[in-house]
């Protein structure tokens, strides 16, 4: 190959096979795609060692993508169940899967995930350091942090979340500005603890070029994590969050100089009226890099329903320009999600992403809605089911409450507006009280 990374290829005017796949999926001119990749406004996460991937693009002018989180924990270490979730995510056309395993030797699951997943794969290496070395957090060395990142890269993951923006300056801002929920990022809180226990700078910030060496070697996309994302609507858009975002913008430019692709991670918990400003801030401060939002969750009072609170925030964020939505399941804040939670989270997030694509004017986004509306006008139930984002549920609901007349449902029966308009416009009687 005459290039090191997808970004390097784009800058050199080299069309990669991954670019060809993305251009075809998106219906975008490949030269336009390549130019936006060269500017860092679109990324194609595709590790050189992930052979089963069907490449996806994330960024400006492309369809909004969704990510599914899964992985083993100490309390739920069933690898086979997590692989069932992987299959469910792929079957439901999720573009990304993040393995957030944080217990034991995570290699076995990660290896199998890379073998079977056509979706791009992300990880948070910070979760793995304690289990990998079987050492307490405070005893982990700088070399060991980077060795784990390289291990994940070598295994074939396409992007890694690294909380490089949590430096000593950001921590000082955190200390000066009281928060209701402190630091809620799991990786961020672990890094904060390591820095405090060792009185050291964040190694991923201090030795950022070493991180870029790994990313360049494997064409590993860098997802710059927001350690200080708000964990409550009270903490949204505060000085700590913005301080870290400014740092992430500076690191983005350094990564681009090395042809390393970058995604910026964002909030978090946030009231609806703050979402548009946050998307604008990310795009300005991080120079148009793709924005990956974790929700946003728009109210803090809905445990058990946070797939809904996040779908509201995600639809808004993506409509304003966010590019990548992390799903949230009904189990958020309560437990590890089961298979049904995963399904519900995917459906809610896909609805949010699609609704945003319509609002953004993504080419062809409305086509399936128009097909659905036409099928409804014709009362073609089979076609409606085939077009539904969750066909299984639509079919089940229809079967659970069967109408007397096939050209209606049990909500309206013969008073169905579509049925009656069709008949009247065809010059027929609607016969509400007697048989047709």
From Swiss-Prot:
Gene3D superfamilies, A to Z: 6.10.250.620, Radical SAM ThiC family, central domain
Pathway: Cofactor biosynthesis; thiamine diphosphate biosynthesis
One GO molecular-function entry: 4 iron, 4 sulfur cluster binding
GO biological process: thiamine biosynthetic process; thiamine diphosphate biosynthetic process
Reactions the enzyme catalyzes: 5-amino-1-(5-phospho-beta-D-ribosyl)imidazole + S-adenosyl-L-methionine = 4-amino-2-methyl-5-(phosphooxymethyl)pyrimidine + CO + 5'-deoxyadenosine + formate + L-methionine + 3 H(+)
Cofactor stoichiometry and binding remark: Binds 1 [4Fe-4S] cluster per subunit. The cluster is coordinated with 3 cysteines and an exchangeable S-adenosyl-L-methionine.
Residues noted as binding Zn(2+) in the record, renumbered to the chain: 269, 333
Stored InterPro entries: ThiC (IPR037509), ThiC/Bza_core_dom (IPR038521), ThiC/BzaA/B (IPR002817)
Residue sites binding substrate per the record: 69, 98, 127, 163, 185-187, 226-229, 265, 292
Record's keyword terms, sorted: 4Fe-4S, Iron, Iron-sulfur, Lyase, Metal-binding, S-adenosyl-L-methionine, Thiamine biosynthesis, Zinc
Matches recorded under NCBIfam families: PRK13352.1, thiC
General function of this protein: Catalyzes the synthesis of the hydroxymethylpyrimidine phosphate (HMP-P) moiety of thiamine from aminoimidazole ribotide (AIR) in a radical S-adenosyl-L-methionine (SAM)-dependent reaction.
Protein name in UniProt: Phosphomethylpyrimidine synthase
Organism lineage: Bacteria, Bacillati, Bacillota, Clostridia, Eubacteriales
């Amino acid at each position: 190959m005459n290039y090191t990374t997808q970004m390097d290829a784009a800058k050199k005017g080299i069309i990669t096979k991954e670019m060809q796949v993305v251009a075809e999926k998106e219906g975008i001119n490949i030269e336009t795609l390549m130019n936006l990749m060269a500017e860092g406004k679109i990324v194609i996460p595709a590790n050189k060692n992930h052979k089963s991937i069907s490449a996806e693009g994330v960024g400006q002018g492309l369809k909004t993508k969704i990510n599914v989180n899964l992985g083993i924990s100490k309390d739920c270490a069933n690898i086979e169940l997590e692989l069932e979730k992987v299959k469910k995510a792929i079957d439901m056309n999720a573009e990304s899967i993040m393995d957030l395993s944080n217990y034991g030797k995570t290699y076995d699951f990660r290896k199998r995930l890379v073998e079977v997943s056509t979706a791009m794969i992300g990880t948070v290496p910070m979760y793995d350091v304690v289990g990998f070395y079987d050492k307490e957090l405070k005893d982990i060395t700088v070399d060991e942090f980077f060795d784990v990142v390289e291990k994940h890269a070598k295994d074939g993951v396409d992007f890694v979340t690294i909380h490089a923006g949590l430096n000593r300056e950001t921590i000082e801002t955190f200390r000066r500005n009281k928060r209701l929920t402190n630091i809620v990022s799991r990786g961020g809180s672990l890094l904060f603890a390591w820095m405090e226990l060792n009185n050291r700078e964040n190694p991923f910030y201090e030795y950022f070029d070493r991180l870029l060496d790994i990313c360049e070697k494997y064409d590993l996309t860098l997802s710059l994590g927001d350690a200080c994302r708000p964990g409550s609507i009270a903490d949204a858009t505060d000085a700590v969050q913005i301080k870290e975002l400014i740092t992430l913008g500076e690191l983005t430019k350094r990564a681009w100089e090395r042809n390393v692709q970058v995604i910026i991670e964002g909030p978090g918990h946030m009231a609806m009226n703050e979402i548009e400003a946050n998307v604008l801030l990310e795009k300005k401060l991080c120079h148009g890099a793709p924005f990956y939002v974790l929700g946003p969750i728009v109210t803090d009072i809905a445990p058990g329903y946070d797939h809904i609170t996040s779908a509201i925030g995600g639809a808004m964020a993506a409509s304003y320009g966010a590019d990548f939505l992390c799903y949230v399941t009904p189990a958020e804040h309560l437990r590890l999600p089961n298979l049904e939670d995963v399904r519900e989270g995917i459906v809610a997030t896909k609805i949010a992403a699609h609704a945003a694509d319509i609002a953004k004017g993504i080419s062809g986004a409305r086509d399936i809605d128009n097909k659905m509306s036409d099928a409804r006008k014709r009362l073609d139930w089979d076609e409606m089911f085939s077009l539904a984002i969750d066909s299984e549920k639509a079919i089940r609901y229809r079967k659970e409450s069967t109408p007397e007349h096939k050209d209606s449902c049990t909500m309206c029966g013969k008073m169905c507006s579509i049925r009656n308009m069709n008949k009247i416009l065809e010059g027929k009687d609607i016969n509400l009280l007697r048989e047709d």
